[in-house]
């Protein structure tokens, strides 16, 4: 049994397979998952696990070069906006796009990790960086 990192075998596999600029979505429970994009559904019940908790866990094991958020989070979800700002301070480039554009960009993702988050616009597209 693994002692460190992600115990979820699908998440561990996806993170290990990511290459430079590949994208991974962390989503709330309402984001539509595009057909053909792998979904790892972590949702247990409304609010669990949360978006930020899940994002923090992924970021502990993932080199994020760029993060894309829906611009609507600035007005409707201050916690997500605050997290975006902290990611920028840690060195990730940020993009903000309309929620409709965000959903279109999800079609190119390697996978979507669906959380139980039930606050608006709690979604991010993470683009993989390199560790060297």
From Swiss-Prot:
Q: Where does substrate bind?
A: 28, 99, 121-123
- What Pfam families does the record tag this protein with? RbsD_FucU
Q: Is the keyword Isomerase in the record? A: yes
Which superkingdom, per the lineage?
Bacteria
Q: Which family, according to the similarity comment?
A: Belongs to the RbsD / FucU family. RbsD subfamily.
What pathway is this protein said to act in by its record? Answer: Carbohydrate metabolism; D-ribose degradation; D-ribose 5-phosphate from beta-D-ribopyranose: step 1/2
| InterPro entries hit by this protein | D-ribose_pyranase, RbsD-like_sf, RbsD_FucU
**Which GO BP terms, alphabetically?**
D-ribose catabolic process
Query: Where is it chiefly localized?
Result: cytoplasm
For this protein, the record's NCBIfam families field holds:
PRK11797.1 (NF008761)
Q: Where in the cell is it found?
A: Cytoplasm
One GO CC annotation, please?
cytosol
UniProt-listed Enzyme Commission number(s): 5.4.99.62
Entry protein name:
D-ribose pyranase
């Amino acid at each position: 049994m693994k002692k460190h990192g992600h115990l979820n075998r699908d998440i561990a596999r996806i993170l290990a397979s990511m290459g430079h600029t590949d994208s991974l979505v962390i989503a709330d429970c309402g984001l539509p998952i595009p057909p053909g994009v792998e979904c790892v559904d972590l949702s247990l019940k409304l609010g669990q696990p949360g978006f930020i908790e899940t994002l923090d866990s992924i970021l502990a094991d993932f080199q994020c070069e760029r993060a894309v958020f829906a611009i609507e989070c600035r007005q409707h979800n201050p916690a997500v906006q605050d997290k975006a700002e902290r990611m920028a301070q840690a060195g990730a480039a940020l993009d903000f796009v309309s929620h409709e554009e965000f959903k279109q960009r999800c079609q190119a993702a390697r996978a979507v990790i669906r959380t139980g988050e039930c606050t608006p616009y709690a979604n991010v597209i993470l683009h993989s960086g390199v560790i060297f």
